[in-house]
């Protein structure tokens, strides 16, 4: 078995590490650098440049130089975040046939984000092969903890395109914890990993413990924002420079791709310089020209001004920390150490915000650019058997479930559940004689299915026709160690089964992910009322169904006056079910239960046989199995 390399596939930079002599080691690329820019360029003569070579020529070839494509993986072109990026990058973002966000070269060639990422992975693979002197085919690749199923699949696809068998997808904060904690002594402790990279933000609360001589890393909770990172900080600086230049010269540089690329490089440099100095000067001669001649950009930027420009971005990263702590059932005082990961954490304002929130200074002995790759290499070593006595227990970031009767989202696996995991639940049909059901798989935190992210739909056909509520359909969710979901539905009577590896059409947008949790908090009361209304409707539907069956069975044996009262109560309840008044539905249900009980008693007395009315009783409730029933849902056009 060859080496399993560890790769941090970053938005801005990527890093490669291996296990050597039982310890992680970062491998320098062909240029001698320990990190590689995640940039790919296509030249006029057909050459593909990757890393520093691509970055060097970006100013002269902006429309064919692709960076930060990790922010596009698993996203639809129509996503608000993608639309926001359209005018902020010099290259073209386009819509693929399935609605996904792709990129296009100046001559119109369309490329998937996975293809661009694969070029970066190919360079990392070759770097490893040159260093090791042997072929490398296996890797552990990191992703943001808040990446969803689609984005994880896309990352695996990028690895496959690059010729790598991706043995494991591992969350970036978890990898950083592995790198930090593997050799640390001192007993059990809880740490927070604050990971603010080039394009994404994650925070994970992790417990490191010694269990029977084995070092165990257990993720207690994770949260994040898949569209917050250093690129957003750079954009604030770019916007400021563009606005200042526009005020001074009356020229909007946003319409000039060449100027935009120069501004991006200058903004990034200025941001980095201001981490160690109080003031810098952005000087870009010949940035553009008009009828009066060439124009030069020369603007002073202070650290205080930069901090004011990005203040809301820094504050935006603190709320996920609060949620993660709450989900873990901890207070800030319970966290012994805070680890900073990602290049953007070098900014003093970010470090101060983290220190203020957690009430302790974050550790400075972890390299924010290399820790994630080292952790990936350690996980590769565990899989290959080179690293012993390490157990990693990660979690799924969002709840997973299906849509059930009444538009309810029924959770099968809760968020922050340790993976790999498997869970199943038994459901039933909503209609008499129903021979097929549609399983609608969703991801999110809202009670109402329509507010969650649709991941996939598939049909289970061939169900033996039977009265509603009788078929037993077992739906199973299986999340593997990569966080990738497999769903199956099985008719327990016929043993007919349908399995699917969920491959979503796109990833979750930033606003969708954040709002899933935020809206769940804000709409908790609304969701509770909706849930109660659906339960009342479902109970009423079951009561109507069982009462009609009782009329059919016993109607000829009892008086017409009683049947008339039952029919009248049925009509009133059927009308109430069409409305949204839970109290009225419950009141009409109670009335029907009472007259249906009279029907049952009359039929029993008539027959003098005790149990022939079973199933028609007023208290005939919807079977427990049917509390969350299937309804056939038509494919929407998300």
From Swiss-Prot:
Q: Which family does it belong to?
A: Belongs to the heat shock protein 70 family.
Q: Where is this region: Disordered?
A: 598-621
Free-text function comment from the UniProt entry: Acts as a chaperone.
What is the recorded name of this protein? Chaperone protein DnaK
Q: What PANTHER family is this protein classified in?
A: HEAT SHOCK PROTEIN 70KDA
Q: Name one Pfam family in it.
A: HSP70
Record PTM Phosphothreonine, positions in chain: 200
**UniProt xrefs under PROSITE patterns:** HSP70_1 (PS00297), HSP70_2 (PS00329), HSP70_3 (PS01036)
Give this protein's Gene Ontology molecular function annotations. Answer: ATP binding; ATP-dependent protein folding chaperone; unfolded protein binding
- Tell me the gene name: dnaK
Q: Which domain of life is it from?
A: Bacteria
Task: List the signal peptide residues.
Answer: none
Q: Which UniProt keywords apply?
A: ATP-binding, Chaperone, Nucleotide-binding, Phosphoprotein, Stress response
Q: Which InterPro entries match?
A: ATPase_NBD (IPR043129), Chaperone_DnaK (IPR012725), Heat_shock_70_CS (IPR018181), HSP70_C_sf (IPR029048), HSP70_peptide-bd_sf (IPR029047), Hsp_70_fam (IPR013126)
Induction text: By stress conditions e.g. heat shock.
């Amino acid at each position: 078995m060859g080496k399993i390399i560890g790769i941090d596939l970053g938005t801005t930079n990527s890093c490669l590490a291996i296990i050597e002599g039982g310890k992680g080691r970062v491998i320098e690329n062909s240029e001698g650098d320990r990190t590689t820019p995640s940039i790919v360029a296509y030249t006029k003569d057909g050459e593909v440049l990757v890393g520093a070579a691509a970055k060097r020529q970006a100013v002269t070839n902006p429309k064919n130089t692709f960076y930060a494509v990790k922010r596009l993986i698993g996203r639809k072109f129509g996503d608000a975040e993608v639309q926001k990026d359209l005018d902020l990058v010099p290259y073209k973002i386009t819509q693929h046939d399935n609605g996904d966000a792709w990129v296009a070269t100046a001559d119109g060639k369309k490329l998937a984000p996975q293809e661009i990422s694969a070029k970066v992975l190919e360079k990392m693979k070759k770097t490893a092969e040159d260093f090791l002197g042997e072929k490398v085919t296996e890797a552990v690749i990191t992703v943001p903890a808040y990446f969803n199923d689609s984005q994880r699949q896309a990352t695996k696809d990028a690895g496959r395109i690059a010729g790598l068998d991706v043995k494991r997808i591992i969350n970036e904060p978890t990898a950083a914890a592995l790198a930090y904690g593997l050799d640390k002594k001192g007993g059990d402790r809880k740490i927070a990993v604050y990971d603010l990279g080039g394009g994404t933000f994650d925070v994970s609360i992790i417990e490191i413990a010694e269990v029977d001589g084995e070092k165990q890393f257990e993720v207690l909770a994770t949260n994040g924002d898949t569209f917050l990172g250093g690129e957003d900080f750079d954009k604030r600086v770019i916007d400021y420079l563009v606005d200042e230049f526009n005020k001074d010269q009356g020229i909007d540089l946003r319409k000039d791709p060449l100027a935009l690329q120069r501004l991006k490089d200058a903004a990034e440099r200025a941001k980095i310089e201001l981490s160690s100095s109080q003031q810098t000067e952005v000087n870009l001669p010949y940035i553009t020209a008009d009828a009066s001649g060439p124009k030069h950009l020369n603007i002073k930027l202070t650290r205080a001004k930069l901090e004011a420009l990005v203040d809301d971005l820094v504050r935006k990263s603190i709320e996920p920390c609060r949620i993660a702590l709450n989900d873990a059932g901890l207070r800030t005082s319970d966290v012994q150490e805070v680890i900073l990961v990602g290049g953007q954490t070098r900014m003093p304002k970010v470090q101060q915000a983290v220190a203020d929130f957690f009430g302790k200074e974050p550790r400075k002995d972890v390299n924010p650019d290399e820790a994630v790759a080292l952790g990936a290499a350690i996980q590769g070593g565990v899989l290959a058997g080179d690293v012993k006595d390490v157990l990693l227990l990660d979690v799924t970031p969002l709840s997973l479930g299906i849509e059930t009767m009444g538009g309810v989202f029924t959770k099968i696996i809760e968020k922050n559940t340790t993976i790999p995991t498997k869970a199943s639940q038994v459901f039933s049909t909503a209609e008499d004689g129903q021979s097929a059901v549609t399983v609608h798989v969703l991801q999110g935190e809202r009670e109402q299915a329509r507010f969650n992210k649709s991941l996939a739909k598939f049909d289970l056909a061939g169900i033996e026709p039977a009265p509603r509520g009788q078929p037993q359909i077992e739906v199973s969710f299986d999340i593997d160690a990569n966080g990738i979901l497999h769903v199956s539905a099985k008719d327990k009577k016929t043993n007919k089964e349908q399995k699917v590896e969920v491959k979503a059409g796109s990833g979750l947008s930033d606003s969708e992910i954040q709002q899933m949790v935020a809206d769940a908090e804000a709409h908790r009361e609304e969701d509770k009322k909706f849930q109660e209304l659906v339960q009342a409707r479902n109970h009423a539907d079951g009561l109507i169904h069982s009462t009609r069956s009782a009329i059919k069975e016993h109607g000829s044996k009892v008086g017409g006056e009683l049947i008339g009262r039952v029919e009248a109560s049925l009509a009133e309840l059927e009308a109430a079910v069409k409305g949204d008044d839970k109290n009225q539905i419950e009141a009409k249900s109670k009335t029907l239960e009472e007259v249906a009980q009279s029907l049952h008693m009359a039929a029993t007395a008539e027959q003098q046989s005790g149990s022939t009315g079973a199933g028609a009783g007023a208290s005939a409730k919807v079977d427990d199995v049917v509390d969350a029933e299937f309804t056939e849902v038509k494919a929407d056009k998300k």
